[in-house]
């Protein structure tokens, strides 16, 4: 049985980080942070969703979405716990229980996600 692609994170940043580390032990997990009112976030989300369409059902990539306005404490607390500067839009890619890479804004392209996934 395959796992659902999307995961829901706890509101507490430390609990969310633990959940991400656990979920990424056997799959890539991408946290996509976005603002619902930012055109740059809209463009980056489009690129991310285009990349998601290229995945097949067997590809072990899971996704967690964070709305940086509605979930501000989680968005900022998670990056603080990772010692990464908060950005929006921003992708945080976890593999093997660790943060493998992160990037933001114009760097969030379908090609970059494909590269990160090793496809």
What are the residue ranges of the model-derived segments?
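Thiol-based oxidoreductase modules, predominantly thioredoxin-like and allied folds used
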Residues: 33, 58-75
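Conserved strand-to-helix beginnings and helix N-cap segments that scaffold or border functional pockets
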Residues: 42-45, 75-76, 106, 110
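Short cysteine/histidine-rich metal-coordination sites, predominantly Zn2+-binding motifs
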Residues: 53-57, 112-114
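Local sequence-structure signature of Cys/Sec-based thiol-disulfide redox active-site neighborhoods
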Residues: 19-55
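N-terminal leader/targeting and pre-domain segments
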Residues: 1-27, 119
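Non-catalytic, surface beta->alpha helical segment in thiol-disulfide oxidoreductase systems
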Residues: 85-87, 92-119
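Structural alpha/beta surface segment adjacent to cysteine/selenocysteine redox centers
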Residues: 75-88
């Amino acid at each position: 049985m395959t796992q659902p692609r999307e995961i829901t994170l706890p509101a507490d940043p430390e609990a969310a980080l633990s959940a991400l580390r656990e979920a990424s032990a056997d799959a890539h997990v991408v946290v996509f942070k976005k603002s619902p009112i930012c055109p740059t976030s809209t463009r980056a989300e489009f690129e991310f969703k285009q990349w998601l369409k290229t995945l097949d059902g067997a590809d072990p990539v899971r996704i967690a979405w964070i709305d940086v306005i509605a979930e501000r404490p989680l968005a900022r607390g998670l990056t603080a716990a990772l010692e990464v500067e908060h950005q929006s839009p921003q992708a945080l890619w976890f593999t093997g229980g660790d943060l493998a890479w992160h990037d933001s804004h114009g760097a969030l392209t379908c090609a970059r996600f494909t590269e990160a996934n090793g496809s």
